């Protein structure tokens, strides 16, 4: 099981992320798309990677956007798995 990252570690890692916010418990990002189906395609990519590494986000789907939240529900904070998934999403949305 992953360990919680310290606020200092999260701040350092966020420097490598693109537009992710941190509220003390989770990291979040809103991603906009040209079409609804583009957002659904991204949801599917995120779901496949989340299953592969066994670290699942909370996802909110809008018309042409999604909001992604990462936290460890078991530990109550941000872990390396959260950061790993955020980096994956940043790579897929360049």
Identify the role of each PLM range.
Residues 1-36:
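N-terminal first-folded block
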Residues 19-22, 47-57, 93-94:
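Short arginine-rich
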Residues 29-34, 66-73:
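Alpha-helical scaffold segments that form or flank carboxylate-/histidine-based iron centers
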Residues 44-45, 87:
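Solvent-exposed alpha-helix faces
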Residues 62:
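RNase H-like, Mg2+-dependent phosphodiesterase core
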Residues 68-92:
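C-terminal structural segments of small proteins and small subunits
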């Amino acid at each position: 099981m992953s360990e919680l990252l310290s606020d200092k570690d999260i701040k350092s890692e966020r420097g490598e992320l693109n537009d992710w916010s941190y509220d003390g418990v989770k990291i979040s990002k809103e991603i906009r798309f040209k079409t609804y189906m583009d957002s659904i395609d991204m949801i599917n990519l995120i779901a496949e990677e989340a299953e592969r590494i066994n670290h699942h986000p909370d996802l909110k789907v809008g018309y042409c956007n999604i909001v992604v939240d990462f936290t460890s529900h078991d530990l109550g904070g941000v872990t390396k798995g959260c950061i790993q998934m955020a980096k994956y999403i940043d790579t897929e949305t360049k």
